[in-house]
Amino acid sequence: MGVAAPHAAAAALGTELSWGGNIAITSNYIYRGVSESDGRAALQADLHANTPGGTFAGAWASTRERSLEPGAGYDFEIYLGHRFDLSSAWNATLSARSHYFPGATEGTSDDFQELSAALTWLDRWTVSVSAIPNAVRYWYYTRLSRSPAWIADTTGQWLIGEGLFLTGGAGYYRSSGTGAGRLAATGYGYGNAGVAFERRGWRVDVGYFLAATQAQELFPYPLANHRVAGTVSWHF
């Protein structure tokens, strides 16, 4: 009896979990104002599990341009979080994620961890604040050090027709810095606007992306300024 109880608990947990995810292909892997695919297409996938109480965990992966730092052909990320329903319209989310560059050819790791808090209205508008305690700091294509970074951003989508949305987002990335000159604290803004169409689990996004030139001072990736990108995804 003492052995059977843990198995029963595990089985009960398994029946309570709900699973989901998506598979996507994008013409340009743009994230926070820079392109990690060097303007080329990327394949991406996500798989996650949710509990009835609001806890979720999952994994996400994307191909990327191997010639860019740190010499990895793809990104891999695991995450854990909890969603709090504040009312019928509002919810808050706390989450943590760990980002990896498997198979990187450079000798020094660019892996990092991130903590985030988000507030969402009707799953249509979200504002979030994130902290990266060990963010890697670059000066163009030269790796300098690690220093804490903060990110504030907002995203939204507005229904304008059956399955048709206007989309948009804006954010600001701030590196705390570790000294003077090229090591000084700095930051940059980024944003996007576009349209999206959803039907039967499929979604098509087309967006126009902007980013301040200061992004090139912090990341060894091409700037995604005045760029158009499209993504096709299937959600299950």
Where are these predicted regions, by residue range?
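Transmembrane beta-strands of outer-membrane beta-barrel pores
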Residues: I25-Y31, A61-E65, F84, S98-P102, ...
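Outer-membrane beta-barrel "beta-signal"
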Residues: W158, A193-W202, Y208, P222-F236
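Detector for outer-membrane/organellar transmembrane beta-barrel domains
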Residues: T108-G179, Y208
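Repeated loop/turn-to-beta-strand initiation elements of outer-membrane beta-barrel proteins
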Residues: G53-A59, S88-L94, D123-V129, W158, ...
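Outer-membrane beta-barrel architecture
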Residues: D46-H48, Y79-G81, S95, S116-A118, ...
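Outer-membrane beta-barrel translocator domains and adjoining extracellular loop/strand segments
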Residues: Y31-D38, S67-Y74, A104-D111, R137-S145, ...
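Short glycine/proline- and aromatic-enriched beta-strand/turn motifs that initiate or cap beta-hairpins
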Residues: A10-S67, S130
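Residues that define the transmembrane beta-barrel architecture of outer-membrane proteins
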Residues: T15-L17, G39-L43, A72-F76, W90, ...
